[in-house]
UniProtKB/Swiss-Prot annotation:
GO terms for molecular function: glucan endo-1,3-beta-D-glucosidase activity. GO terms for biological process: carbohydrate metabolic process. It catalyses: Hydrolysis of (1->3)-beta-D-glucosidic linkages in (1->3)-beta-D-glucans. Keywords: Allergen, Glycosidase, Hydrolase, Signal. SUPFAM superfamilies: (Trans)glycosidases. This is Glucan endo-1,3-beta-glucosidase. InterPro entries: Glyco_hydro_17 (IPR000490), Glyco_hydro_17_plant (IPR044965), Glycoside_hydrolase_SF (IPR017853). The active site is at 122 (proton donor), 264 (nucleophile). It holds the Pfam family Glyco_hydro_17. PANTHER family: GLUCAN ENDO-1,3-BETA-GLUCOSIDASE BG1-RELATED-RELATED (PTHR32227).
Length: 340
């Protein structure tokens, strides 16, 4: 997870409502599995923990061979990242892309159920690797095609909400000029191949960046009524407003039929101000699980696939909140109770 850009949303005074229901299993929810810790359980135990908690999808940030081996015959669907260290070589060398797919995907398919390949995480627009994302995506797609897997496994890239130059109101959502230079052709690639755009969505960072304009209930899905009225669209939570701003931005560059997959979203349980608490983290993530099945005001009834960030608190990340997004401690005990 990189630093998230805040989104400016006009604030309103809100009342806090109470979470009143425990969700049943939601198939559209996954959890991100990071490994930046020196005390984490082995991948085989992690996969068992996913299964015992009815977590049906996993985001894996690099093709860790022990994790892929543990995922065999687990029925867990996998979003697999191409790490930034591989992006440039895969962009410039189709043979390298073929080798990458053979080694990390074909070798495990179909006993590992790959869903997406994410070429890079939050590398657009500011990274020096941004120019290599689309060529790498094309080479990975061609490698999947050679293996006959282009219809089963979709190729995309993960961006953060900093790619939005305009986000309020949501219907005015538009990519910044810097991001659009890269994203316009990427969106055309996604549209032509039926692939979604992967977006990391963090109402937490929007709230902490604009506490005078954004209320905590709006960020936590606990607002008691409509907060933002945007023409015919009514918004009661910030998550929907952010996702719909991305949909609007996609429409502006010819991506009206491109889906959005929320490749990261979460709330820290400690390490920041008072808003970083176990109570707020539980409330946000449980409400996210409850919410995604109903779509957004701009896409009502269309389930939003989302991945909670993240499975464990990781002690080798930067201090503060970065170490405290986990649903579980490294000893596999829950940081707080949550139901999938």
């Amino acid at each position: 997870m990189a630093t998230k850009a805040s989104l400016s949303i006009k604030g309103f005074a809100l009342l806090v409502s109470v979470l009143v229901a425990v969700p049943t299993r939601v198939q559209s929810i996954g959890v991100c599995y990071g490994m930046l810790g020196n005390n984490l359980p082995p991948p085989s135990e992690v996969v068992s923990l996913y299964k015992s908690n009815n977590i049906a999808r996993m985001r894996l940030y690099d093709p860790n061979q022990a994790a892929l081996q543990a995922l065999r015959n687990s029925n867990i669907q996998v979003l697999l990242d191409v790490p930034r260290s591989d992006v440039q070589s895969l962009a410039s060398n189709p043979s390298a892309a073929g080798d990458w797919i053979r080694r990390n995907v074909v070798a495990y398919w179909p006993s590992v159920s790959f869903r997406y390949i994410a070429v890079g995480n939050e590398l657009i627009p500011g990274s020096d690797l941004a120019q290599y994302i689309l060529p790498a995506m094309r080479n990975i797609y061609n490698a999947l095609s050679s293996a006959g897997l282009q219809n089963q496994i979709k190729v995309s890239t993960a961006v953060d909400t900093g790619v939005l130059g305009t986000s309020y109101p949501p219907s005015a959502g538009a990519f910044s000029s810097a991001a659009q230079a890269y994203l316009s052709p990427i969106v055309q690639f996604l549209a032509s191949n039926g692939a979604p755009l992967l977006v990391n969505v963090y109402p937490y960072f929007s709230y902490t960046g604009n506490p005078g304009q954004i209320s905590l209930p709006y960020a936590l899905f606990t607002a008691s009524g409509v907060v933002v009225q945007d023409g015919r669209f009514s918004y009661q939570n910030l998550f929907d407003a952010i996702v719909d701003a991305v949909f609007a931005a996609l429409e502006r560059v010819g991506g009206a039929n491109v889906a959005v997959v929320v490749s990261e979203s979460g709330w820290p349980s400690a390490g920041g101000g008072a808003e970083a608490s176990t109570s707020n983290a539980r409330t946000y993530n449980q409400n996210l699980i409850r919410h995604v099945g109903g779509g957004t005001p701009r896409r009502p009834g269309k389930e939003i696939e989302a991945y909670i960030f993240e499975m464990f608190n990781e002690n080798q990340k930067a201090g503060g909140i970065e170490q405290n997004f986990g649903l579980f401690y490294p000893n596999k005990q829950p940081v707080y109770q949550i139901s999938f």
